[in-house]
Amino acid sequence: QPLVDLEGNLVENGGTYYLLPHIWALGGGIEAARTGKETCPLTVVQSPFEVSNGEPIRIASQFLSTFIPDGSPYAIGFANPPSCAASPWWTVVETSEGLAVKLLEHKTPEEDDTKFKFQKVSSPNRYVYNLSYCQREDDDLKCDQYIGIRRDAKGYRRLVVTNDNPLELVLVKANSPSQ
């Protein structure tokens, strides 16, 4: 099945969406924050405020398709990234907190290869997904590690690579009646 938003519509390749927790009381949408010694917001976090949609994100598949094909990995980035970021696209980097989802201040060749994949969750709401991180191993792309939340010492809800408690998300089209 192709990727669909909360209203059951196909997710558009290159389209702009909010990523929200499927249970309203578990925080808000996804956004960038300045953490640690960062001088600008490069860390991808979940808003602590349930009423916040976060920032709109863009989902882009390498396939020339108007929608996101089933099972394909894709790039995810902010539609309006901070000006200090070298690219809008998310990447995964090693931090003191483990593997974390971030924006980079300086462009690297590896950043262009970072891919993610939504995996459908068994839920009464048919449109709930986990987000997986995809790693290249030899010629294969393995998408077997989840993206979850880890609170840091200052209370930021950072998106990290984990095998425990994956984040369960819905996609809401930016500027849709559901937002």
Curated annotation (Swiss-Prot):
The keyword Transcription regulation appears for this protein: no
Species annotation: Erythrina variegata (Indian coral tree)
InterPro entries listed in its UniProt record: Kunitz_inhibitor_STI-like_sf, Prot_inh_Kunz-lg
Disulfide-linked positions: C40-C84, C134-C143
Site (Reactive bond for chymotrypsin): L64, S65
Protein name (database record): Chymotrypsin inhibitor ECI
GO terms for MF: serine-type endopeptidase inhibitor activity
Keywords: Disulfide bond, Protease inhibitor, Pyrrolidone carboxylic acid, Serine protease inhibitor
Similarity annotation: Belongs to the protease inhibitor I3 (leguminous Kunitz-type inhibitor) family.
Positions where Pyrrolidone carboxylic acid occurs in the chain: Q1
Function (record text): Inhibition of chymotrypsin.
UniProt keyword Disulfide bond present: yes
